[in-house]
Amino acid sequence: ILGKFCDEIKRIV
């Protein structure tokens, strides 16, 4: 769950 969110956050970091 919240996989897309984690991917976006990881990309920003």
From Swiss-Prot:
GO terms for cellular component: extracellular region; membrane; other organism cell membrane. It is found in: Secreted; Target cell membrane. Keywords: Antimicrobial, Membrane, Secreted, Target cell membrane, Target membrane. Expressed by the venom gland. Belongs to the non-disulfide-bridged peptide (NDBP) superfamily. Short antimicrobial peptide (group 4) family. Amphipathic peptide with antimicrobial activity. Negative results: does not show antiviral activity. This is Peptide Hp1478. It comes from Heterometrus petersii.
